[in-house]
């Protein structure tokens, strides 16, 4: 009984050991605690407002997009860089300025929606073991350590970007897998789960199929990854890259969001970035295309490719963009475009012997870290008090 109670009181987070200074593209699953402007959410995580919209396949090109209001309870994917800190993968770039009535518990459980615990924030900032519900000094700057993993940006040897997902009340591994176009088996392997059982507050690493870039190491956007069914902005918002829905090949075009862009014309060609020409012949189809090759020394690099294909390609299909929502659909997160390949979402999981937190063979070398949830019983009270005070300010 004591062991069962201890297990119930612990919250699991998948961690990835690391060494070195390399980073990778990652996503944070964040649920809004109040109605917020796009720019406010972006500022909270130090992200670009348009990049935030692009990562969620929301219209990022419309005028005033950054000032659109997002409804409370809306789940979002926040793009971040996953670094190596203290021997484990985490995002450590976020800084939060405490406001009146903030506590460690309210910052962890409400403002950052459970992505970090009060204990983790306390440790990251060298604070004393004070009451997590004691008010913080207004204006104090806090480092917010946020969970992320890289796992070589692959899943089953295919390009993938990993989403840090906070388990919500009513979630099951099956429902999480189905809403993210992956499988129970895959989630269990990645998170080294002995059995497909989760509790609210657990943080899972969710592999999302993605389109990978092949830019040179000298490119400032080297390693760009775009999750299937979404977009990413790069080169100072001069270039937009998309993934899917027809295939998992990165496709980049001019973004037309700023006039301060270098030339996007392919060398020795009249083609501009994203242009494709096709000419049918008796032997097939001659296809020429101008592709994005990264931002090198502040200049947009392009690459011209030509070749004979069996048939001429049709018009490129882009992932659909949706308008900024005004109400929350309680169904799920953004549904990715269908990805090529086998594997049904929410499939059955083969039994893993034992209950260890060791990754199965051929799986990523992650592990499950459990931290005390002593602060979690205060979450509902903190939410009510914090939101009430928030609207009085």
Predicted features, each with a name:
Residues 24-32, 91-94, 246-253, 259-263, ...:
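Extracellular/mature segments of secreted proteins
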Residues 314-318, 322-379:
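C-terminal GPI-anchoring signal of eukaryotic secretory precursors
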Residues 2-23, 388-393:
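N-terminal signal peptide
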């Amino acid at each position: 009984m004591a062991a069962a109670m201890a297990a119930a009181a612990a919250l699991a987070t998948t961690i990835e050991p690391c060494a070195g200074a390399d980073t990778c593209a990652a996503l944070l699953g964040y649920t809004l605690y109040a109605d917020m402007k796009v720019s406010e959410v972006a500022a909270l995580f130090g992200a670009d407002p348009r990049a935030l919209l692009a990562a969620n396949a929301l219209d990022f090109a419309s005028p005033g997009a950054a000032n659109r209001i997002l409804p409370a309870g809306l789940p979002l994917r926040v793009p971040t860089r996953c670094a190596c800190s203290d021997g484990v993968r985490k995002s450590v770039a976020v800084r939060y300025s405490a406001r009146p009535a903030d506590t460690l518990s309210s910052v962890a459980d409400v403002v950052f929606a459970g992505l970090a615990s009060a204990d983790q924030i306390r440790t990251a900032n060298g604070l004393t073991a004070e009451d997590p519900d004691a008010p913080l000094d207004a204006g104090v700057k806090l480092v917010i350590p946020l969970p992320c993993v890289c796992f070589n940006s692959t899943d089953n040897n295919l390009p993938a970007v990993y989403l840090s997902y906070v388990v919500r009340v009513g979630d099951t591994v099956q429902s999480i897998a189905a809403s993210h176009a992956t499988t129970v088996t895959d989630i269990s392997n990645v998170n080294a789960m002995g059995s497909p059982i989760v509790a609210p507050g657990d943080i899972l690493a969710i592999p999302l199929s993605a389109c990978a870039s092949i830019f040179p190491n000298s490119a400032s956007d080297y390693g760009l990854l775009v999750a299937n069914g979404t977009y990413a902005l790069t080169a100072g918002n001069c270039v937009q890259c998309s993934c899917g829905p027809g295939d998992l090949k990165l496709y980049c075009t001019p973004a037309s969001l700023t006039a301060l862009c270098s030339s996007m014309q392919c060398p020795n060609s009249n083609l501009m970035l994203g242009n494709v020409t096709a000419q049918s012949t008796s032997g097939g189809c001659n296809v020429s295309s101008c592709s994005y090759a990264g931002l090198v020394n502040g200049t947009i690099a392009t690459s011209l490719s030509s070749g004979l294909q069996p048939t001429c390609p049709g018009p490129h299909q882009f992932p659909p963009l949706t308008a900024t929502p005004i109400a929350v659909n309680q169904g799920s997160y953004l549904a990715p475009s269908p990805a090529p390949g086998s594997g049904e979402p929410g499939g059955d999981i083969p039994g893993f012997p034992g209950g260890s937190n060791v990754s199965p063979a051929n799986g990523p070398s992650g592990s499950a870290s459990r931290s005390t949830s002593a602060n979690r019983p205060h979450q509902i009270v903190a939410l009510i008090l914090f939101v009430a005070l928030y609207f009085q300010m």
